[in-house]
Amino acid sequence: MKIVLLYYFVNMFISGIFQIANVEVGQHFYWSILGFQIHGQVLINSWIVILIIGFLSIYTTKNLTLVPANKQIFIELVTEFITDISKTQIGEKEYSKWVPYIGTMFLFIFVSNWSGALIPWKIIELPNGELGAPTNDINTTAGLAILTSLAYFYAGLNKKGLTYFKKYVQPTPILLPINILEDFTKPLSLSFRLFGNILADELVVAVLVSLVPLIVPVPLIFLGLFTSGIQALIFATLSGSYIGEAMEGHH
């Protein structure tokens, strides 16, 4: 009996090693729109995530009452959580108008990350590549990071006008190149941190599912869900921090 079990696990392990070659990285399904090549699966994934967020938002805010029910309690907790992030990072005077932006970033990234682990994307076949979390594509994370860059530039210019650019020569003009470089490294760090963590998590789970499909991947999936939530929180927190920094002028 022991020999049979040993043979079974060895055979499963060897078969899994050969299946690892089927784990695709960087495969894309392209759409050609007005002469531009667009990642079709990213658009599909993103719209699915947006529809999920939209449905949950409508469902949980329908028929609001003074004494909240379960679904209303849930959406109030989410709103309070996002509001606290914005208030902490941006400040009590300016945070209110940035709650929608911070909330949009957090919810989109959070649902995108979780969708990669919870939605069985592989049942939907594409001519090339496969569906998955939108945030496992560098184009998505780079786009979100660029939006945050535009947001904190707008926040600084809107509050300070052209005097906003004084920060580049403070406390001394010698730091001008470093201060300019900082504005390029912020979106880079935001995009690559999110992309790297989500892609690595999905690849590790895919490889382990091929090697040991029954036991090992389950706790890793739960760990991945926790990590995905943390990454959404980090992105939203840093976005709020950069916006608050732009308005206050602190480094």
From Swiss-Prot:
Record gene name: atpI
Signal peptide: none
Pfam family membership, one: ATP-synt_A
GO cellular component, as recorded: chloroplast thylakoid membrane; plasma membrane; proton-transporting ATP synthase complex
Function as written in the Swiss-Prot or TrEMBL entry: Key component of the proton channel; it plays a direct role in the translocation of protons across the membrane.
Classification via HAMAP family: ATP_synth_a_bact
Organism this protein belongs to: Euglena gracilis
This protein's record includes keyword Chloroplast: yes
Similarity comment: Belongs to the ATPase A chain family.
Protein name, entry field: ATP synthase subunit a, chloroplastic
